[in-house]
Amino acid sequence: MLTCSVHPLPYRANPADYFAIIRHAPGAVLLDSGRPTADRGRHDLLSAWPLEQLAVLPDESGSDFLQRLRDNLTRLGEASVPLDLPFAGGLIGYLSYDFGRHLEQLPSVARDDLHLPDARFGLYAWALISDHQLATSQLVFHPTLADSERQRLIELFSGTTSDEIEPFRLTAPMSPDLSADEYRQALERIQQYIQAGDCYQVNFAQRFRAECQGDPWAAYCALRAACPTPFSGFQSLPEGGAVLSLSPERFVKVSQGLVETRPIKGTRPRGQTAAEDAANAAELLASPKDRAENLMIVDL
């Protein structure tokens, strides 16, 4: 098996510093652990200029799309990494919940007014990875990447960016899809379903939206500063927009035959003092109800 090559760079705890250099590049993507404020994640990963951009077609089956992804991985070729790094080249992207309809026969009652593919991935032959345990940042190159492209990336990240970031702002207030009365009525129906034994948990959510203008990267940086989370990401879209994701939860991780999920269930209010915080945390940890709910979510 071929081995990836590695080029060290100055360590930067905040991946936004490096990502700003490539944020306008095609297929720019950042997987962000929220450092230096959030402390759970170990690695950040960013890349751009994918070899291929792959989106599921409206009438394409999920199995056919997944096979296309596998075929592209095969064409890239397997490679090992010389260090304990999480990426040797491969696919980065998103699978929406609606992608499930490409796999299963499910009812479709929501109107598609975003017109985004239900899944989109890029095939990447390089990445810049920061390891916050070892305090290192380095470029990782798949062995198939041309020498000229490796040198271009080394020179690019050895420089600085002076681009001005266009401020991001909402040009109208956020508005929900459901009115307050519609939301209340839906909650009442859910309670009736639970009391009747038809279900025992409902993930009831709604969408808020507003007109906006400016650079989506500026919006991401503002959200990141206000609420750093260990499972965050920024993915640019070919049409000029972006997908921004900031979550304290890991939905699922599959590695070496093991599956891990990190849901968060159960809350307590912040206290006025550190002692109150500690007492609330101890109460939460000792709560049979909250533990049972968390175990139920893991089982599901």
Segments the model singles out, each with a brief description of its role:
Residues 1-300:
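Extended alpha-helical targeting/anchoring segments
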